[in-house]
């Protein structure tokens, strides 16, 4: 039986569905837009059904397109998996590893982990993707990422199909300017009510990390909506700089402020009788083939945790 599609056509359909644009899909796949359009027309002709809606320069999948995309993603994932299996047989402990991480982890924690892993296993090629927890989890489910460490909430419809393991606790620290009166106290400890007298700098309200911090605060009887938020920024780095310049206070991950603590550009204060933590998780797809490179990285993560305890 001759199949009415090629793997490249499946990749093109997936890219269009992801990018929602012929132009951006062509850029991602490093092909010309006319060539991409021709491939899609050929695919639709051979299948004898429309896969895409093209209205007012907006591209979306038809019902048939959505159904076919599900099978396309599974076919592509199996093809990539078969290549990894064969590569494992040929290379032994050598190979490729695709790691994912949510934003804060990917910026501050993962580089240290990967540096040690690369030192111990220089024969393994590592590719890293940093994005929101939702996007990383979706790519793990689709088989695009081998293993990931995330700190946000994973959507239930994705989480139920993943292997999710609690990894480490990440403490959320309250940082203030060194010139703030609280920083000049001998014991840098405040009570719960003091929080409502601070000027806060936060991430944008639609940020996954901001929502996570707010939810944790609500669970331990804080009312973040009553905080005096004077500034919303789009990155942890910008927030740390603003705090160091004396503009306000902020909650940040403990892993994000090691440099600032060493340089003494900010001050940490504790909240009496309260410790705010979140759980970082290791996620993988139990249905995907697990290469030797993934096993080595997985074991390295747990070794690092056990040696740091």
UniProtKB/Swiss-Prot annotation:
Q: Which residues bind DNA?
A: 22-41
Q: Which domain of life is it from?
A: Eukaryota
Q: Cite the SUPFAM superfamilies for this sequence.
A: Periplasmic binding protein-like II, Winged helix' DNA-binding domain
Mention any Pfam family matching this sequence: HTH_1
CDD domains associated with the record: PBP2_CysL_like (cd08420)
Query: What gene does the UniProt entry assign to this protein?
Result: rbcR
- Entry function: Trans-acting transcriptional regulator of RuBisCO genes (rbcL and rbcS) expression.
**Which is a Gene Ontology cellular component entry for this protein?**
chloroplast
Q: Name it.
A: Probable RuBisCO transcriptional regulator
Tell me where it mainly resides. Answer: plastid
Q: Which InterPro entries does the record match to this protein? A: LysR_subst-bd, Tscrpt_reg_HTH_LysR, WH-like_DNA-bd_sf, WH_DNA-bd_sf
Q: HTH lysR-type domain: from which residue to which, for each copy?
A: 5-62
PROSITE patterns from the entry? HTH_LYSR
Listed GO molecular functions? Answer: DNA-binding transcription factor activity; transcription cis-regulatory region binding
Tell me the organism.
Answer: Trieres chinensis
Cellular compartment(s): Plastid, Chloroplast
